[in-house]
Amino acid sequence: METILSLSGVSWRHKVRDFSSWKPWAKRDGAGIYSVDLEIKSGTILGLIGPNGAGKTTLMRAICGLYDCEGFDKSSETRRVEIGYMPEQVRWEGRITVKQALSSIAMMREDSVDVGNLIQTVGLASKSDQMLDSLSQGMRQRLSLACALIGKPRLLVMDEPLNGLD
């Protein structure tokens, strides 16, 4: 099987306020991920399990290039195009429809996806002309999944994808 993602010694530390300093803006290294080695091959299904604060979301965000981690090339074009990311929560708001939102995102990603088919795939066919403000939390999760699927990514990273699903 083909390797689609490889990490070697990847680390990231969140910056937190340093209350021991007399400077109110001072920051220090907080929790994070340390020296992660990971290889994901095509067709692999991988789950991250651990207690709150273990670094699962941090690792997922690092994989997607949202953090500038040590030992990881965030600038890779592959990362932008070939990874679909579904965050734990997205605040879908606004006076546009589900269909308009997905069409706009597809345009930004320079992808000519069949939005109607994508809406059908994630179970939002009956909601395609509804405004984002009127969607339930479960419908918003489905919309996030649809966004992650735009571009037919080779790697799909989902952070608590079933949270709030109807």
Residue ranges and their predicted role:
Residues 145:
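Hydrophobic anchor residue at the start of the ABC signature
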Residues 156-160, 165:
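Catalytic Walker B motif of ABC-type/P-loop ATPase nucleotide-binding domains
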Residues 103, 112-127:
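Conserved ABC ATPase "signature" region
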Residues 131-138:
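Conserved ABC ATPase signature
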Residues 89, 94-108:
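Q-loop/switch helix immediately C-terminal to the Walker
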Residues 64:
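Helix-to-loop junction immediately C-terminal to a conserved catalytic motif
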Residues 49-51:
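The feature captures the beta-strand-to-loop junction immediately N-terminal to the Walker
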